[in-house]
């Protein structure tokens, strides 16, 4: 269809004269229009054929761009660069993320220690070189799957391993730091509280027992901590250094605000050594001049005293208070007994004991003769006055005499004797009828007019 340029009437392309106004159409213009329409149609066909190729080319360009983007972030070299940049820039959070595993969570403070350790024990330049070389060799190798970066002293500091692939094309490199277990061995049951792996942690260690406090990556650590014992609570640090260990464990040095007490006693020469005690903060312990007591918190006063026995009497020192301001890691204190009081008492008791021993010597000399006479004559009356009537020992000896089973004794010696009220205990060494020396313990009762009678006896 075409329009009349004069009146606008629509007409067929092959019409030569307008039927409304009689205008004569130009035949050349019709031919041109027809040619133009054919060209447009031809061009449209060509364009439709080119579109798929253009789309394919565009997709190819996108794939190439995507490949290079993935390569920049996921190739072994890119993975290495991420770790290197984090260490170079002291990015402890990034390093913590890269080194954390399912079994061992690394927190940012631990990563900070690790970064410093690498720089001190390997050197940043050497570490970067070793890491790049290791990754390159692993990436090219078809057999090796893991290798270690080491410190100058030969300790493993980083494990580099191939762990599958990323996006089909790239080897996935894993970076993990080897771990060791710091161990404590307290003198008494102790509770430790500190932060590890980004979380608060509590470890309870029994006295004199090796106890691990966790798993840590290489470094020189000084961890803020609290510890608690029956003596109190302490603030301080747990310190350990991987350089000082060639095994799977590393010893912990405790650095807490604590005081250890060394005690010296004076005026105690007459006291029984095994009876000497030290009481610190109401807790009584055996005394030893070579022992230190504690530890105790340095922020609290300490009360201390000592006691001991002489001739079964307990003597004590005055209680001293050590002010918190005077407490040091090693604190020495001297406790004084009243030596004159002790010596006077010992002298008095020794006189009494000598008098008692003399009485017992005389008593057992007569008893041994009476015992033997009762045996020889089968007559209990010879020995009955030496034994308290109604006691089990009285009945036992009487029965033995009647059966002829009473043992003969001789040469009694008084080894030891003590008196408590009207009761006396004595250790006597005898020779029995078989000629053997035996020690027997007797209990006697002192009645009216200081008369002694046996109550019971037993072998020592």
UniProtKB/Swiss-Prot annotation:
The keyword NAD does not apply. Residues 1-49 are cytoplasmic. GO terms for biological process: response to antibiotic. Residues 71-460 are extracellular. The chain crosses the membrane at residues 50-70. A zinc finger (C4-type) spans 4-21. Pfam families: TcaA_2nd (PF22813), TcaA_3rd_4th (PF22820), TcaA_5th (PF22819). It is a single-pass membrane protein. Belongs to the TcaA family. Plays a major role in decreasing resistance to glycopeptide antibiotics. PANTHER family: MEMBRANE-ASSOCIATED PROTEIN TCAA. This is Membrane-associated protein TcaA. It comes from Staphylococcus aureus (strain NCTC 8325 / PS 47). The gene is tcaA.
